[in-house]
UniProtKB/Swiss-Prot annotation:
Catalytic activity: XMP + diphosphate = xanthine + 5-phospho-alpha-D-ribose 1-diphosphate
Keyword Transferase: yes
Superkingdom of origin organism: Bacteria
SUPFAM superfamilies tied to this protein: PRTase-like
Name of the protein described by the UniProt record: Xanthine phosphoribosyltransferase
Broad EC category: transferase
Glycosyltransferase listed as a keyword: yes
Species assigned in the record: Bifidobacterium longum subsp. infantis (strain ATCC 15697 / DSM 20088 / JCM 1222 / NCTC 11817 / S12)
Sequence intervals crossing the membrane: none
Gene: xpt
Chain positions recorded as xanthine binding sites: 20, 27, 157
Residues where 5-phospho-alpha-D-ribose 1-diphosphate binds: 129-133
C-alpha cells in the first residue's frame, strides 16, 4: 500500500534493535482515515472469504481491527487480552506469546463465548515481526475450532521472517507494507514489493 509506505518513510523512525517507531499515525496517535483505507485494502484482498469475526491482540491492533470490520459487514471484533481480569468470567482459551516489542512472554486470553467453532476469522495486527503474537492468535482459533481465513497486517518486518513462515504454512497473509531492511544509523527504510 503506497500510502502506508510513504507515511512510514516520512514519519517513521528507525531505532536500534530492529524497532520501527510509527506512533504518529499507527499505534499511539491513530490516523482513522488511513485505517479506513487499510480496511478497504484488506476487504478487497479477502473478498472471496466468508469472514464472520476479526481477532486481534490488545492494544495496538484494536483500532485498526475495529475500523477494518466496517469493510466486512461490521462483523464483531474480539481482542485477546494480555492479562487475567476480573471482567473475564467463565471458560476461556489461553495461550502464551512472546512480544518482540516488550521483550517478554505474557498470557493472552479470549472468553470461549466470543470465539466459536463456526467462526471464520480474519486476524489483524499492526506489526508482524517474528510471528509470535500471530502464532498465539492462531493457537486460540485452533483451540476454539475456528477457521483462520486470513491475516491482515499493517507493517511486516520482512527481514525477521515471521510472515514468510506463516505463508509457507499456507496462511493467506496480506501485509500492506513489508519492510525489507532498516538502518538505525541512516534512518533508511526499504520495502519489499
Amino acid at each position: 500500500m503506497q500510502e502506508l509506505e510513504e507515511r512510514i518513510q516520512s514519519e517513521g523512525t528507525v531505532k536500534e534493535g530492529d524497532v520501527l517507531k510509527v506512533d504518529a499515525f499507527l499505534n499511539h496517535q491513530c490516523d482513522v482515515r488511513l485505517f479506513d483505507r487499510m480496511g478497504s485494502a484488506w476487504a478487497a484482498h479477502f473478498a472471496g472469504k466468508h469472514i464472520t469475526k476479526i481477532l486481534t491482540i490488545e492494544a495496538s491492533g484494536i483500532g485498526i481491527a475495529c475500523v477494518a470490520a466496517q469493510h466486512f459487514g461490521n462483523v464483531p471484533v474480539v481482542f485477546a487480552k494480555k492479562a487475567q481480569s476480573i471482567n473475564l468470567d467463565g471458560d476461556q482459551y489461553t495461550t502464551t506469546v512472546y512480544s518482540f516489542t516488550k521483550q517478554k512472554e505474557f498470557p493472552v486470553i479470549v472468553a470461549k463465548k466470543y470465539l466459536n467453532a463456526g467462526d471464520h476469522v480474519l486476524l489483524i495486527d499492526d506489526f508482524l515481526a517474528n510471528g509470535k503474537a500471530l502464532r498465539g492468535l492462531i493457537n486460540l482459533c485452533e483451540a476454539a475450532g475456528a477457521t483462520v481465513e486470513g491475516i491482515g497486517i499493517a507493517v511486516e518486518k520482512g527481514f525477521q521472517g515471521g510472515g514468510d513462515t506463516l505463508r509457507a504454512e499456507g496462511y493467506d497473509v496480506d501485509s500492506l507494507a513489508i519492510v525489507e531492511s532498516m538502518n538505525p544509523e541512516t534512518g533508511e527504510i526499504t520495502f519489499r514489493h
